[in-house]
Amino acid sequence: MASSSLSTLCSSTSSSLHPNSKLSHSLSAKLSSKANVSVQFLGKKQSPLLSSTPRFLTVIAMAPPKPGGKAKKVVGVIKLALEAGKATPAPPVGPALGSKGVNIMAFCKDYNARTADKAGYIIPVEITVFDDKSFTFILKTPPASVLLLKAAGVEKGSKDPQQDKVGVITIDQLRTIAAEKLPDLNCTTIESAMRIIAGTAANMGIDIDPPILEPKKKAVLL
């Protein structure tokens, strides 16, 4: 019924258009009964179907969704921290992905290929799993602690960072690390990122030369 009314409207509207208008000859032929159509008349506020005066009109047609165009549903998000280029089906990868039905070998192959140039680093990855068992993933930057240890040339941080210092990095090294971590930090400037990374370094017993943070002062009770 709606389709029939629409065809009648289009035919009547087409006949009321200016005789030389190309739209008047093709409007009815081009509009699909499956399309959602909005017809807007521009000009004086009077019925266009009852007037013999030519009218301009705007036709907005929206095509129906394509077959199979249904959006995928996210069924899980998995976060892992893996060594670059060395992902295998062994834990933690296998159990984490297997429980969601993800193709484990396909993930390992893709992850290793995308991190091959970062050998020696731990690269966090966030995997989004969909209801059809397909997946996508994004790589994060290495943890700041890993970058700081690499820059300082030490294997681990200090158990007592205030008293036992394990290494020193330069201000240029700090800036390089801050620039790399900036996309994952809750700040927008390199200076703010440097202060955040410097705080992490201080908690690990790694000094910055020259320092950019004021030393903590112990409160003295009188």
Curated annotation (Swiss-Prot):
Record-linked Gene3D superfamilies: Ribosomal protein L11, C-terminal domain, Ribosomal protein L11/L12, N-terminal domain
Any one GO biological process: translation
InterPro entries noted in UniProt: Ribosomal_uL11, Ribosomal_uL11_bac-typ, Ribosomal_uL11_C, Ribosomal_uL11_C_sf, Ribosomal_uL11_CS, Ribosomal_uL11_N, Ribosomal_uL11_N_sf
Disordered: region residues: 1-20
Subcellular location: Plastid, Chloroplast
Transit peptide: 1-62
Keyword line: Chloroplast, Plastid, Ribonucleoprotein, Ribosomal protein, RNA-binding, rRNA-binding, Transit peptide
A Pfam family the protein falls into: Ribosomal_L11
An annotated Gene Ontology molecular function: rRNA binding
GO CC annotation: chloroplast; chloroplast envelope; chloroplast stroma; cytosolic ribosome; nucleus; ribonucleoprotein complex
SUPFAM superfamilies: Ribosomal L11/L12e N-terminal domain, Ribosomal protein L11, C-terminal domain
SUBUNIT field: Part of the ribosomal stalk of the 50S ribosomal subunit. Interacts with L10 and the large rRNA to form the base of the stalk. L10 forms an elongated spine to which L12 dimers bind in a sequential fashion forming a multimeric L10(L12)X complex.
Family: Belongs to the universal ribosomal protein uL11 family.
PANTHER family for the chain: 60S RIBOSOMAL PROTEIN L12, LARGE RIBOSOMAL SUBUNIT PROTEIN UL11M
Stated role: Forms part of the ribosomal stalk which helps the ribosome interact with GTP-bound translation factors.
Protein name: Large ribosomal subunit protein uL11c
Organism listed in the record: Arabidopsis thaliana (Mouse-ear cress)
